[in-house]
């Protein structure tokens, strides 16, 4: 993960990857991940690595938001340090990262191209009624979402996602398009 400015798209070389002008979605990878939907929330199963990394990822994101001035050190020590922030979790899968971000006070939108994963995320989130007002899951691509949500979010998180993206330039450009002006992005 890194913290990037709105000009991040200028920093990513192509590495010989052919960029599609239409979508960043790797359909084969989406299908593969969708097949894991039933085990997504099993902390001892195939997703155990994501679960085990979560505390570290959350701390990294919150620290990144402090370091970029989005939240203060005073906010950092509150039970809900992200209160009032609008976050987009792109490639949220079954919601392993989106749920704790919402519990920390952020109004969180989880976005994924995998319908089965979004369905699992919604079912799991419904077990905690406190999340209902702060967490929304959407089955969509970043391209579609960005077209209707320009300069909407305080931060965009794309954790453990870039390696699953077919067109990295389009992906990052569309993520950045959803950010409010002069905001940085933990990714």
Predicted regions and their residues:
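A general structural signal marking secondary-structure boundaries and capping sites
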Residues: 37-40, 44, 65, 69, ...
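N-terminal, positively charged/glycine-rich alpha-helical extensions of SAM-dependent methyltransferases
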Residues: 2-47, 51, 55
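Short hydrophobic/aromatic-rich motifs at helix boundaries and adjacent loops
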Residues: 29-35, 70, 93-94, 147
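Conserved alpha-helix/loop element of class I SAM-dependent methyltransferases that forms part
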Residues: 52-83
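Conserved SAM-binding loop
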Residues: 73-187
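Solvent-exposed, charged/polar functional surfaces in cytosolic regulatory/catalytic domains
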Residues: 32, 36-40, 60, 64, ...
